[in-house]
């Protein structure tokens, strides 16, 4: 997977929905894997048991990302839903499937 790091860390300041799974606030290890032809992001809570998976699409950036950023939407239950991630130094952003 050229242009993206296979492992990252991310902190959620509040409960967050990832791929349909609600996880609590905390620090997470994020692993990018290929399952067949699909890209999958796996989130595992550091020091906890929470885990979530989401399919993602890689969207090329015009240059290396200068910062790490996340983009969220809000669902009908007013929960934060992670929809996109960009990690500093990567040349693609991760767009998560709901």
Language model regions located:
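Short acidic, Pro/Gly- and aromatic-enriched capping/linker segments at domain boundaries
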Residues: 1-17
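Mid-chain, structured segments of secreted extracytoplasmic proteins
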Residues: 38, 42-87
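A sequence-level detector of short linear motifs
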Residues: 24-25, 52, 93
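Short, low-complexity, Pro/Ser/Thr/Gly-rich segments in the mature regions of secreted, periplasmic
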Residues: 89-97
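A short tyrosine-centered beta-strand micro-motif
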Residues: 26-32
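A generic structural signal for short beta-strands and their flanking turns/coil linkers
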Residues: 6-8, 26, 37-39
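Solvent-exposed, non-transmembrane regions of integral membrane proteins
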Residues: 11, 32-33
């Amino acid at each position: 997977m050229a242009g993206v790091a296979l492992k990252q860390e991310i902190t959620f300041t509040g409960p967050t929905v990832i791929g349909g799974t609600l996880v609590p606030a905390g620090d997470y290890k994020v692993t990018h894997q290929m399952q067949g032809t699909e890209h999958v992001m796996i989130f595992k809570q550091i020091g906890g048991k929470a885990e979530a998976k989401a399919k993602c699409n890689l969207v090329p950036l015009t240059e290396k990302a200068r910062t790490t950023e996340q983009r969220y939407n809000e669902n009908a239950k007013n929960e934060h839903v992670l929809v996109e991630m960009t990690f500093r130094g990567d040349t693609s952003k991760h767009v998560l499937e709901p």
